[in-house]
Amino acid sequence: MERLPLLLTNDDGVNSPGLLNLASALNRLGHPILVIAPLKEQSASGMKLTLRNGMKFQEHKELAKSIKINKDSDLRIFSLDGTPCDCVIVALDGGLNKITPEISPSLCISGINRGPNLSVDIFHSGTVSAAREASLYGLPSICVSLATYSHENYSDSISCTLQIVDTVSRLLPIKPPNLLRPEGSKMKFANKELTSVQNSFLLGDIFLNINVPEVWNGEIQTVNLGARWYQNASDMMSNDLNEVTFHVGAATIIEEEIENTDCVSIKNGYASITPLASWPQSHPLGLSNKLIEEALEYNIKTGLPSWL
C-alpha cells in the first residue's frame, strides 16, 4: 500500500516533542513527511500572517536525521520565523515544491499540540488555524491536540492519530483534487461516487479537530463543539512608576455539561473528533446545517465519523 505524503506543522515550534514524535511515528509507517513549522512558539496566534517582514527559512537536516526511522521514506524538516498559517502558505503556495519536489502532500496534519483545543479554543489556536489554512487552499486537513498540560507523554495521542490517518488514507487520493482551488468556488464534487460530506473533506471545505485526553480510554467519539468559558481572563498589574501592564490567561475555566460535545468527551476519557466547516456559513462554499449534521454522524463500533 502506497502511503500518503503528509505535510506536518504546529504552533508549538519546530522543536516541540508532539510534532517530532508524530513525524517519527508516521515516518516509521512509510509516509513521506514534509515538516514546516514555526521557528519559535506561536501558541494562540490564530490565523495571524506576517505581512511586513521577511521570514527566515531554514532546513534542519540533523533534526530530521535524529528522528528518521524508515530509511526508504523521505523526511525533511524546515522552520520558518513566522506563524503557523505562514508556514502552511509557504508550504503550499510559496515555491517550497521546488525545494522538495519529492514530497507533494496529500494531507495536512497540524500538531500534536500541547494543551486542549476545545470549544472556543478553535478561534484562537494556531494549531487549528494551520489546519484551516491548509483546507482553505484545498488540502484535506486534520489537527490534533493533547488536551492536558499535566504531562508531555504523546503516546496515546500518536496512537489515536495513526488510527485516524489510516482511516482517512482509504478515502484520499495521492493527488489532492482541489489543491490551490484552481476552479475557485465552482468545484463541488471531487468524486461523484462519494457522498457530499466525503467530497467536502476532499475539497478542503471540512476539516477535523481532534483532542486526546490526559488519560485515554482507547475509544473515540465524534461530537459537537462544547461550551467552554474563560473567566477572569486578564490580570492588571502596576509598579511604583504607576505603569500598568495586563496579562491575558484565564484564572477559571468553566465547561458546561452538554452531551455529545468535545468538552464532555475529553472529561470522560474519550478522544474527540469534531468536523469543522472551513468557511463561514455565508461564504459561497459555506456548508448547510444538513451537511454539518451529516458530518457528525458516527460509526457506533469505532466512534469515527461514519463517512470515513
Give names to the regions the model predicted.
Residues 116-125:
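Glycine/threonine-rich flexible loop motifs
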Residues 9, 36-38, 110-113, 143-145, ...:
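Short beta-strand segments
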Residues 121, 135-157:
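Glycine-rich phosphate/pyrophosphate-binding loops
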Residues 156-308:
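Electrostatically charged, flexible surface regions
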Residues 2-9, 16-102:
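A cross-family phosphate/adenosyl-ligand binding-site feature
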Residues 25, 130-135:
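Hydrophobic/aromatic ligand-binding patch that stacks against planar heteroaromatic rings
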